[in-house]
């Protein structure tokens, strides 16, 4: 059932990224962008957990957030800690 929902969600995100995002300009404070993060999270963790991770990411993407590198956790992680991905200003 979740795969039936997963593929249309990823398609909608790709449409957003291709057609709408260029009109809005680069506003995401994170790398990868929030739409890319959502696609990877849904593909990696399935519909429900992927949407949850994407919603948490979107809640952190605002002008008061420093941003930086915030990858989707790997699927061996048991718990997601958004504080572990804060930008320190030092990039490799």
From Swiss-Prot:
SMART domains: Haemolytic
Organism of provenance: Xylella fastidiosa (strain Temecula1 / ATCC 700964)
Family, as annotated: Belongs to the UPF0161 family.
UniProt keyword annotations, A-Z: Cell inner membrane, Cell membrane, Membrane
Topology in membrane: Peripheral membrane protein
Highest taxon listed in the record's lineage: Bacteria
InterPro entries linked to this entry: Membr_insert_effic_factor_YidD (IPR002696)
Cell compartments where the protein resides: Cell inner membrane
One Gene Ontology cellular component: plasma membrane
Protein's UniProt name: Putative membrane protein insertion efficiency factor
Residue stretches of biased makeup (Basic residues): 83-92
General function of this protein: Could be involved in insertion of integral membrane proteins into the membrane.
Disordered: annotated segments: 65-92
């Amino acid at each position: 059932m979740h795969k039936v929902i997963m593929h249309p969600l990823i398609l909608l995100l790709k449409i957003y990224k291709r057609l709408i995002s260029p009109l809005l300009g680069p506003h995401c404070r994170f790398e990868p962008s929030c739409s890319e993060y959502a696609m990877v999270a849904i593909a990696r963790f399935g519909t429900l957990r992927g949407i949850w991770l994407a919603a948490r990411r979107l809640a952190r993407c605002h002008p008061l957030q420093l941003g930086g590198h915030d990858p989707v956790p790997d699927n061996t992680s048991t718990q997601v800690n958004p504080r572990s991905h804060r930008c320190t200003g030092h990039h490799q």
